[in-house]
Amino acid sequence: EMQRSLVGSEMCIRDRLFVVSFTILLVGCDNDLGHQSPDDEWTAETLVSQADVERSGVDAWFRSETISDQIFSRMWLKSWKEDCPLKRSELRYLKVLHRNADGNPQRGEMVVNAAIADKVIDVFRRLYQADYRIERMVLIDNYDADDESSMRANNSSSFNFRFMTGSTTKISKHGLGLAIDINTLYNPYVKQKDDESWHIEPATGEPYAFDRENKTNIPYKIDHNDLAYRLFTEAGFEWGGDWTSLKDYQHFEIDL
């Protein structure tokens, strides 16, 4: 009888220890994700708990800042080339939240022209509040400013200095920070070449390049019913999906 009592006591103690340990583990996990502030060092693709978003207020997580030395060092000789005529002061580093593929709040970053920074911040805030999904939003410098690599990763980005195809003087809209690409893998650039073959960027976006009107299984599809289309065009942007000589479904650009 005494032995059964001792065994029962040991089991009870083990159960209590398990509950305490499990509780500590849960709290620890929550601390790994939670208790973040928008004032912390900003690392894109980091998850943020809904509680922390609410604690600071949504607006605090959407900011436009000048290009710091740290950010510029990431851009140097990648998105920022030596022949770039823009001044650093003409660009802004955006900190935003977006809903990732799983619908969870995630830190994002983007460099845009200073003249449109507030406008873009407002669009991304409204997209976030509407639970709009953007899988990834990091500087294209994470991909050595290689468009194809960035697009294959379904990365959303803006500034990447370059001249327009065939020109050594005319800067592209991305080169001015006046164009934004959203969910790039599933909204590719599509142009028919002279030999009637197709040029598609990214190349892995070919399954999403044609007959888009009749396809209902394209993730992140941008069309005239899409919220990103509505918000960007309301803000004065032009959508590449409306072009006739080619289609650039990921692309929104604006004139100053």
Predicted regions and their residues:
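Conserved short secondary-structure elements within globular domains
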Residues: 69, 135-137, 141-171, 231-240
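C-terminal motif of bacterial Sec signal peptides marking the signal peptidase cleavage site
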Residues: 26-28
